[in-house]
């Protein structure tokens, strides 16, 4: 794991030294002295606009001309227009710096924070850069046994020189704790489905959360049957691995602090069931539990900080598999709420899992607010691509708060519509509702949201986040490699911290 330290005075023991330059291409007094130490290398570089323009995100790695000392490289990072810098952009810049250092095999980095950006203190700026670098250091290579030495290379440490290093370190410790929660979410999402069975996944949740003072209850199929969870159990009935409902309760607030319930879809692997998925990308269905992973990661972050809030997490862990016992198209299931659902398509299974999970959360904990998170529909990816998750809500204020926080942490949400006409499209002739629309290929994400909405009680504020397009990525970003993104943890953690 990347080691991050904050110091008040610069050290000469790092192989790479990072400085920040904005698009004005001017050196402040501190950088002038550093430039002189390096025989004008910084000023010569920024004078040549073919080499460096100072635009945001530009990174220039230059071999040092100093013959003595440990510094082998100067790394010049572009800030662009300082007025347009956001916390998210600063974090991403930290990630880019780490990635460039890794590609250049620079094992130790020093960062010199000399810039005075009006909207950010040097402590905030430094902690954000460190947070981005730490997030970008994540790897999932535990099953790669033949990695070459060059592929194993990782930056060992970052040392950040800034005023008031003690205060900066405190800011970073919170960000590091949140990043480690993101890492749990990425880890469990990246894990192959033959390893992370519902039982194993539940055990990992217990092992991670109980030391943080979170009460965890793992409910098996017998108890779920007694509770009447026919929708969730129907999804998992084709698997030889028993389905689980994991209930997490963090009681950090007083009794008069309203409870927020986070509910996650945890389909460990989704074949589509008898309504079989195409084989080409079916291996990616190991990520179909990304919503549940975001819920668990959020509770790790909240409990780790001992926030004065009351949070409940409920995740339904199932496998949607083919067998002689698998659920059939046309089956009717009775949900915990007593409502019945006709299963017209076994690949629309996530909403069935959530139906029982959100009802259980409301029945047992009486929350003021329910937020469910799910890799629910391919339709949301068609609508929004891989930039935004879809946000459906019965409460404008709740939706606005989530969207605002999403912009701040760069986990973007786009408000999607709910309408009575969509609700009418899940009519069934033989049950209370159908799990897909009676109009083929129409408004798929909206239809799924309305199915879940049928299980939200009157007076409960509700938001449904469809993260199917953003939970995993087929390319690296500034904050991590391709694979599981860990989307939702930072969004929900900040929402809970700021608005409860």
From Swiss-Prot:
Binds 2 manganese ions per subunit. Presumably involved in the processing and regular turnover of intracellular proteins. Catalyzes the removal of unsubstituted N-terminal amino acids from various peptides. InterPro entries: Leucine_aapep/pepB, Macro_dom-like, Peptidase_M17_C, Peptidase_M17_leu_NH2_pept, Peptidase_M17_N. NCBIfam families: PRK00913.1-2, PRK00913.1-4, PRK00913.2-2, PRK00913.2-4. This is Probable cytosol aminopeptidase. Gene3D superfamilies: Leucine Aminopeptidase, subunit E, domain 1, Zn peptidases. One of its GO terms (cellular component) is cytoplasm. Keywords: Aminopeptidase, Cytoplasm, Hydrolase, Manganese, Metal-binding, Protease. Mn(2+) 1 binds at residues 270, 347, 349. Mn(2+) 2 binds at residues 265, 270, 288, 349. It comes from Rickettsia rickettsii (strain Sheila Smith). One of its GO terms (biological process) is proteolysis.
